[in-house]
Every structure is written in C-alpha cells, then in structure tokens.
Amino acid sequence: MNNIKFLLSANNLFNLPKDNGLEIAFFGRSNSGKSKAINALFDKKKISISSKKPGRTNFINVFIMNKKLRIIDLPGFGYSKISKKKSKIKYLLDDYFKSRKSLKILIILEDIRRSVSEFNEKLIYLSFNLKIPVLILLSKSDKINFEKRKKKLSLFKKYIEKTTHTKNIYIEVLTFSSISRDGILFTKKILNKWTNIKLFKLN
C-alpha cells in the first residue's frame, strides 16, 4: 500500500487537509535524517526532500496514501542561524499536536550519537497526555558499531521505562538507518500493527 505522493506544504493549520482520517507524523531536530527515513520507509528516492541547510524546512509537508491516510513531515529546528524563526515553528508544532484530531501516531527521529533533546522529551510528554503512540527511531545507526548501538538502545529503553511506567501508551524504540536499512522492516511491522491496516507489504 506504499503508494505515496506529495499533496501540499502548509505554514499554518488552516492550509492543512480536513481534520479527519489518520495521520502519521514524523518529527526530528535539524539533520536527524528525517527526510531520508521517510524516503527509505516508502521506497521512494525523493518523496521527501531535505533542505541543503539544516533547519530550513519550515513548513508542514503533507503526503497522501489514500483519502483517509496521510504522512506528515513536520519541520525541525535546532540551529542558531534560524533562531528568529524558532518561536514561529514551535507555535506551529504546538498547535498541530494539540488540535489535530487525526494525528494518531508520532515518529520521533533522534541521531543515535546524541542524547534525547529537551524538545523531544517535551514531545514525548505531550504525546502521553494526548495518548498518541510514539515510535522513537535512533537514526544514523550505521555511524557507530554494533556494541555502541546496543548500548545506546538499552539506555534509551531504560529512560523510556522510567518515564512511562505509570502511563497507558504504546511506545517503542528502535535503531534505524536509511543507509544500512537497519530497523526498516521492524518499523513497517510496528506501523502495520498500530494502524491496524496493511500499510506496508511485508515479505
């Protein structure tokens, strides 16, 4: 079912499609590999195009799979060159998360070589309150060796367990690489399960 195509870009919620159906949103700070992850998951070379300068993709990009299922590529930030725009992007994201009823799954990408960013932690807590399933992809896992990947995954899982032990929410953490394709199959399986539809054809 991974027949996906670009629909529109929006810098406010009023320009988004009607708030119905199901939306899977991808979020990651600048240079987290978010666009490459979307391309890899949906087997498209350039369905999601990353900006040449990190943090310059300031719009919500919407991709459609059918009339009721959309993929949302959210803007990321984190670089000083766009500090004046940070507040505008943050308000846009806050409005989307708090008011978008069709948002059903949040996928957060975090460079495996870094720690969880403060903003991403806030996103996770927000997702708890909204009861949205969260999938954390520790991206660029090909950049470190197997032992370091294993250790980092364990650290993230312990953090999640500590944070979510009293919360009733689905949350998963995987290592991921669009280069080595680490985690792609598991990600597809999880999304098939959480959406309760055959989003991806699995061999």
UniProtKB/Swiss-Prot annotation:
Q: Which UniProt keywords apply?
A: Cell cycle, Cell division, GTP-binding, Magnesium, Metal-binding, Nucleotide-binding, Septation
Key word ATP-binding present in the record?
A: no
One Gene Ontology BP term is:
division septum assembly
Give the GO molecular function terms: GTP binding; metal ion binding
A GO CC term?
cytosol
| Cofactor annotation | Mg(2+)
Domain of life per record: Bacteria
Q: Which residues take part in binding Mg(2+)? A: 35, 57
Q: Which residues form the EngB-type G domain?
A: 20-197
Q: Which family does it belong to?
A: Belongs to the TRAFAC class TrmE-Era-EngA-EngB-Septin-like GTPase superfamily. EngB GTPase family.
| Main function | Necessary for normal cell division and for the maintenance of normal septation.
Would you tell me the protein name for this molecule?
Probable GTP-binding protein EngB
Organism of this sequence? Wigglesworthia glossinidia brevipalpis
Name the lineage: Bacteria, Pseudomonadati, Pseudomonadota, Gammaproteobacteria, Enterobacterales
Q: Name the gene behind this protein.
A: engB
